[in-house]
Amino acid sequence: VAAAGACVAATAAGLPKIEVLATGGTIAGSGASATGSAYQAGKVSVNHLVAAVPQLADIAEITPKQVVQIGSQDMTDDVWLKLNKTINEDCRKFDGFVITHGTDTMEETAYFLNLTLRCKKPVVLVGAMLPSTGLGADGPRNLYNAVLTAAEKKTAEQGVVIAMDN
């Protein structure tokens, strides 16, 4: 995926435009201790998540948007509909979409969007196993790889996808 995404950025007239839609989850989790296991999901803003990965600016033009800040166990039809509406309305403005999401219901969100989106651009869901404040947090690398995946036009041929764990 990294090679494909780098190729997109290198050969395009400009960097691909990717909208990062944040819903919360562990990837946006915050805890009192970097080594502790207790944390609250969905506490870190999308602006902070994007700022934590400055390398994103080398591969895409990022537009962050906070949709909700919840743990994915609290995902609802209303949030799914809001994601659907946002992507369909923003489809002409962006080359792809990344949705940061908790892992509890990530596959349900991907399935719903795959069935209902009219937009035929890449849509990539991404999450993490460790909160953003955790030692060795996997969210930054996962977010980077998700943006690479969303920047690749051929990703759209696969429907809505999930990119995690390198």
For the regions a language model picked out, list residue spans one by one.
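Active-site histidine-anchored catalytic micro-motif
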Residues: 10-166
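Hydrophobic h-region of N-terminal signal peptides that target proteins for export
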Residues: 2-12
